[in-house]
């Protein structure tokens, strides 16, 4: 009986020793782990970038401009929420439906746009960074508000548009409170054309749009930004 107890004890000690050894191989000491916790708190981000994309089939939509803005982010574990305000210095062409096809297009002229959005992001590394980096995917909903535009005899105005944008990005934390990030998104909005674009011009009798064409058109706009954030 004593022999059996001693044998069982030796087996148990061997199992425990093997388990501890395996655990030591799989895990990391905190000081040497590639994973580190992200500091909790709101993050104020200053962003700069460039927004391009399609001007639509007619060519009157705003595009090709530098952007600058601010964003406030709040993390909720692996998911984060954000609010953004951005000014875009864009430009657009003017198409005069009352001129012939060779002279009806002019520009480009400045057409500023303000973008407001709210979004959600999923942090792929959870509440931690991997070697200081935290990639994410997400999406934002918002509005784009057109500013003063050049005189347009067709009556076309960019106006206020609903926007949607999927996005991906990468955050780098060189310090506990400081972060640098790059973000790429594809902004979608819908242009609305005036009915004058379907009227034949008085010179060569050619309309801007065919009579069967739609007066609305979705356009896509790649938007790349870099930003610097501070966690409060």
Q: Model regions: which residues?
A:
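Predominantly the C-terminal beta-signal and adjacent terminal strand-loop region
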Residues: 175-232
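Gram-negative (and chloroplast) outer-membrane scaffold detector with strong preference
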Residues: 71-155, 159-162, 174, 221-232
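Transmembrane beta-barrel strands of outer-membrane/channel proteins
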Residues: 44-50, 83-89, 137-145, 170, ...
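Short glycine/proline- and aromatic-enriched beta-strand/turn motifs that initiate or cap beta-hairpins
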Residues: 24-77, 87, 148, 208, ...
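Cleavable N-terminal export/targeting peptides
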Residues: 1-38
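Flexible, surface-exposed loop regions and adjacent strand-edge segments
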Residues: 61-65, 97-103, 153-158, 197-206
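A short acidic/glycine-rich loop-to-helix N-cap element
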Residues: 57-60, 155, 212-213
């Amino acid at each position: 009986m004593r022999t059996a107890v001693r044998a069982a004890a030796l087996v148990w000690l061997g199992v425990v020793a093997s388990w501890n050894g395996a655990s030591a191989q799989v895990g990391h000491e905190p000081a040497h782990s590639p994973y580190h916790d992200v500091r909790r708190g709101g993050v104020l981000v200053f962003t700069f970038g460039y927004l391009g994309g399609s001007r639509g089939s007619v060519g009157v939509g705003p595009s090709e401009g530098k952007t600058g803005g601010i964003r406030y982010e709040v993390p909720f574990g692996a998911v984060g929420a954000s609010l953004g305000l951005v000014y875009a210095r864009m430009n657009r062409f003017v198409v005069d439906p009352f001129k012939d096809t060779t002279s009806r297009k002019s520009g480009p002229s400045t057409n500023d746009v303000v973008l407001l959005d709210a979004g959600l992001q999923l942090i792929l590394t959870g509440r931690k960074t991997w070697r200081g980096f935290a990639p994410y995917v997400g999406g934002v909903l918002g509005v784009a508000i057109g500013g003063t535009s050049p005189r347009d005899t067709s009556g076309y105005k960019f106006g206020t548009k609903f926007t949607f944008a999927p996005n991906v990005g990468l955050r780098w934390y060189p310090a506990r409170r400081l972060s640098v990030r790059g973000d790429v998104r594809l902004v979608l909005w819908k242009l609305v054309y005036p009915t004058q674009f379907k009227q034949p011009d008085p010179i060569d009798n050619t309309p801007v749009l065919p009579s069967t064409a739609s007066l609305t058109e979705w356009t896509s706009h790649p938007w790349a930004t870099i930003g610097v954030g501070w966690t409060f």
